[in-house]
Regions:
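Alpha-solenoid helical repeat scaffolds
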Residues: 29-30, 65-66, 81, 98-102, ...
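Terminal, low-structured helical/coil segments at or just beyond the last alpha-helical repeat
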Residues: 125-148
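Alpha-helical tetratricopeptide repeat
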Residues: 10-13, 17, 25-33, 53, ...
């Protein structure tokens, strides 16, 4: 009897792609991160955007956060602050501290419909969840007289 041949990395990748294309959002989230960061595959932001979108639409909070960052920064897509806000908010509502922080930053951004009280609430939630940057921003705002 022949020993079982271990699948190659390419064969494993093709199997995961097939699962994603069959509608498995967890596999799409996995692929999105692999292509976004270039882990085990060449970095491909177009493919990352495609796979992360599927996962985000299926409620994956980390995919929502990563996709939000792509739209906020214009990395792999055209910048879209409204879309970034929507995605960060979805992730924040699932308790992703970095997303809470980014929701607050967008709410405090010049040119975006400002809601200071809501922004402060998201900053507090993010800081309480242990996100140091949110704590630092709250401290800076308080020092500037804006965080009361």
């Amino acid at each position: 009897m022949e020993p079982t041949k271990e699948p190659t990395m390419e064969e494993k990748l093709q199997a995961v792609i097939a699962l994603c294309e069959e509608g498995d959002p967890e596999m799409c989230a996995f692929l999105g991160k692999e292509f976004y960061y270039g882990w085990n595959v060449p970095q491909d932001l177009d493919r990352a955007l495609r796979y992360l979108t599927v996962a985000a639409e299926n409620g994956d909070a980390i995919s929502q956060f990563t996709l939000g960052f792509m739209y906020w920064s214009g990395r792999g897509t055209e910048p879209d602050l409204d879309k970034a806000y929507e995605l960060f908010l979805q992730a924040a509502e699932q308790d992703v501290p970095e997303a809470m922080y980014n929701v607050a930053k967008i709410l405090l951004t010049k040119g975006f419909e400002k809601n200071r009280d809501e922004a402060m609430g998201w900053l507090r939630r993010s800081a309480n969840a242990g996100y140091d940057a949110a704590y630092d921003m709250l401290s800076d705002l308080k020092d500037a007289g804006a965080g009361n």
